[in-house]
């Protein structure tokens, strides 16, 4: 068992150290896989859209909040218990 293991290990070492695995293909096809530094920089440094200051999205509860502010009872309850609970107690509708 030990000899099989050593033989396998030596075979793998021979394959790793051989010059056949390190040989690079020579020809016009081998250069197509790589690009110059300038071409690479053009790809990496292209303009980045959508990275500017984003516009905050409108609050979906804003109309409800404005309607609740017009009613003094709802406004007082919203200060104590929160907008959703106050709106539900006054108007009976779940937001």
From Swiss-Prot:
Residues 46-92 form the Gla domain. It is found in: Secreted. Ca(2+) 2 binds at residues 66, 69. Disulfide bonds join 68-74. It comes from the Eukaryota. One of its GO terms (biological process) is regulation of bone mineralization. One of its GO terms (cellular component) is cytoplasm. Bone. The modification 4-carboxyglutamate is found at residues 62, 66, 69. GO terms for molecular function: calcium ion binding; hormone activity; structural constituent of bone. Keywords: Biomineralization, Calcium, Cleavage on pair of basic residues, Disulfide bond, Gamma-carboxyglutamic acid, Hormone, Metal-binding, Secreted, Signal. Disruption phenotype: Mice lacking Bglap and Bglap2 show increased bone formation, characterized by higher bone mass and bones of improved functional quality. Mice lacking Bglap and Bglap2 also display reduced male fertility due to decreased testosterone production in the testes. Mice lacking Bglap and Bglap2 are passive and show greater anxiety-like behaviors due to impaired synthesis of neurotransmitters. The keyword Calcium applies. InterPro entries: GLA-like_dom_SF, GLA_domain, Osteocalcin, Osteocalcin/MGP. Belongs to the osteocalcin/matrix Gla protein family. The carboxylated form is one of the main organic components of the bone matrix, which constitutes 1-2% of the total bone protein: it acts as a negative regulator of bone formation and is required to limit bone formation without impairing bone resorption or mineralization. The carboxylated form binds strongly to apatite and calcium. The uncarboxylated form acts as a hormone secreted by osteoblasts, which regulates different cellular processes, such as energy metabolism, male fertility and brain development. Regulates of energy metabolism by acting as a hormone favoring pancreatic beta-cell proliferation, insulin secretion and sensitivity and energy expenditure. This is Osteocalcin. It comes from Mus musculus (Mouse).
């Amino acid at each position: 068992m030990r000899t099989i293991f050593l033989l396998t290990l030596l075979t793998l070492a021979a394959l790793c150290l051989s010059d056949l695995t390190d040989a690079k293909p020579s020809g016009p096809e081998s250069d197509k896989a790589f690009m110059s530094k300038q071409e690479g920089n053009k790809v990496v440094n292209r303009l980045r859209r959508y990275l500017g200051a984003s516009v905050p999205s409108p609050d979906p509860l804003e109309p409800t909040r404005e309607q609740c502010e017009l009613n003094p009872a709802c406004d007082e309850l919203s200060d104590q218990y929160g907008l959703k609970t106050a709106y539900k107690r006054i108007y009976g509708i779940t937001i």
